[in-house]
């Protein structure tokens, strides 16, 4: 019997048993993501199956397989979206970063949100690709000498190291434009025009001066500041805009494309905001606890640059506590949705909390 969630009475019916509290629901979540495990390998973020894994396929969601399938689908769609054509140099620069792998968390989130509200992968794919194009654009620009001056990204030389600063700037610009072109062209006929207009507005807002750009500017202006003079409010502003805004857009776009109601869209917005902050808190922790080899990028760079980070402001232990609190808050936003369809998003929050790179 499928799990039944009631947001009004807050009980959960699962195989004839009733759970009447959020803590009971959290226990159910642990079984739902049993196959996830917090043990991650140091290469590519692959999950190591935990000992004693349940053989009951109905009680455990295989997030690893789900993530691999979605990442492969997204990568195939991205490959088609940027064919090699003249001028070859810019196309090669675009493809170099866009097809460099990665966990594809943002497009996965977009697709899972679409499926949660009744849509399917095909309907969400153009938006999922658009979000990944913008994410890649932001990474190319973020790595430039005038920004973070990074040498490695996903275990490879950064775009400007491979193609030069001029071509890297243009590759990032091209991806930004291509994202909107791709989403609107490919989705034509699949999504109602009014929903497409809203999706475009949401995505544009997420990456402009009310979103990603605002976070990057505040981050740059905060380098070298004394942590004692800067509160958590400023750090949260940076991460809500620089990191969470695009994750939020991914979830909202998926819900819009899938025909979600206003209530469903807002629940997914709050969920994504929580995992967006969670993603960055964990990123800050990994920057001081993992090696360059494990991360696929230069470890300790934020500390060396004097950046504001959660460990720098509140220490490692409190940072871990904040991460767990955000994971729980994200899961709470999924109460009321069909549990089978929500399983990928429950697992995604746990994956982000437990990742090693």
Curated annotation (Swiss-Prot):
Q: Tell me the residues of the organelle transit peptide.
A: 1-37
Which is an annotated GO molecular function term of this record?
Answer: dimethylallyltranstransferase activity
Please give the catalytic activity noted in the UniProt record.
isopentenyl diphosphate + dimethylallyl diphosphate = (2E)-geranyl diphosphate + diphosphate; isopentenyl diphosphate + (2E)-geranyl diphosphate = (2E,6E)-farnesyl diphosphate + diphosphate; isopentenyl diphosphate + (2E,6E)-farnesyl diphosphate = (2E,6E,10E)-geranylgeranyl diphosphate + diphosphate
Q: Does the keyword Magnesium apply?
A: yes
Binding-site residues for dimethylallyl diphosphate, renumbered to this chain? 153, 242-243, 280, 297, 307
Statement: the UniProt record of this protein carries the keyword ATP-binding: no
Main location class: plastid
Please state the Enzyme Commission number of this protein. 2.5.1.-, 2.5.1.1, 2.5.1.29, 2.5.1.10
Sequence positions that bind Mg(2+) 1: 142, 148
Q: Which UniProt keywords apply?
A: Carotenoid biosynthesis, Chloroplast, Isoprene biosynthesis, Magnesium, Metal-binding, Plastid, Transferase, Transit peptide
Note the InterPro entries from the entry.
Isoprenoid_synthase_dom_sf (IPR008949), Polyprenyl_synt (IPR000092), Polyprenyl_synt_CS (IPR033749), Prenyl_diphosphate_synthase (IPR053378)
Q: Which cofactor does it need?
A: Mg(2+)
**Where along this sequence does the record place binding of Mg(2+) 2?**
142, 148
Q: Where in the cell is it found?
A: Plastid, Chloroplast
Question: How many cofactors are bound and how?
Answer: Binds 2 Mg(2+) ions per subunit.
Tell me the GO BP annotations in alphabetical order. carotenoid biosynthetic process; farnesyl diphosphate biosynthetic process; geranyl diphosphate biosynthetic process; geranylgeranyl diphosphate biosynthetic process
Pfam families, sorted: polyprenyl_synt (PF00348)
Assembly notes: Monomer.
The record ties this protein, via NCBIfam families, to: FPPsyn
* Family per record: Belongs to the FPP/GGPP synthase family.
What's the protein called, per UniProt? Geranylgeranyl pyrophosphate synthase 11, chloroplastic
Give the organism the record lists.
Arabidopsis thaliana (Mouse-ear cress)
Q: What is the lineage of its organism?
A: Eukaryota, Viridiplantae, Streptophyta, Embryophyta, Tracheophyta
């Amino acid at each position: 019997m499928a799990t039944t969630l009631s947001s009004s009475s807050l009980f959960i019916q699962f195989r004839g048993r009733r759970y009447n509290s959020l803590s009971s629901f959290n226990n159910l979540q642990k079984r739902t993501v049993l196959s996830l495990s917090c043990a991650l390998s140091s290469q590519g973020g692959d999950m190591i199956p935990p000992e004693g894994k349940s053989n009951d396929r109905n009680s455990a969601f295989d997030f690893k397989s789900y993530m691999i399938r979605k990442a492969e689908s997204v990568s195939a769609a991205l490959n088609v979206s940027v064919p090699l054509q003249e001028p070859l140099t810019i196309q090669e620069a675009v493809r170099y970063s866009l097809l460099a792998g990665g966990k594809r968390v943002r497009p996965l989130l977009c697709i899972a949100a679409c499926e949660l509200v009744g849509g399917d992968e095909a309907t969400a794919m153009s938006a999922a690709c658009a979000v990944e194009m913008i994410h890649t654009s932001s990474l190319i620009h973020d790595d430039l000498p005038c920004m973070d001056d990074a040498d490695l990204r996903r275990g490879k030389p950064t775009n400007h190291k491979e193609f030069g600063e001029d071509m890297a700037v243009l590759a990032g610009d091209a991806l930004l434009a291509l994202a909107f072109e791709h989403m609107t062209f490919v989705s034509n006929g699949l999504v109602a025009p009014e929903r497409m207009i809203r999706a475009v507005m949401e995505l544009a807002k997420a990456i402009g001066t009310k979103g990603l750009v605002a976070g990057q500017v505040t981050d740059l202006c905060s380098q070298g500041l004394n942590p004692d003079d800067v509160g958590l409010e400023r750090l949260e502003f940076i991460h809500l805009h620089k990191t969470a805004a695009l994750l939020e857009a991914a979830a909202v776009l998926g819900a819009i494309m899938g025909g979600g109601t206003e209530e469903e869209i807002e629940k997914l917005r709050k969920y994504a905001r929580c995992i967006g902050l969670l993603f960055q808190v964990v990123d800050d922790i990994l920057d001081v606890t993992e090696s360059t080899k494990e991360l696929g990028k230069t470890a300790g760079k934020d500390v060396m640059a004097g950046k504001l980070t959660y460990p720098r402001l509140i220490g490692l232990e409190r940072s871990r506590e904040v991460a767990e609190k955000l994971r729980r808050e994200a899961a709470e936003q999924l109460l009321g949705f069909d549990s089978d369809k929500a399983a990928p998003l429950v697992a995604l929050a746990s994956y982000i909390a437990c990742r090693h790179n």
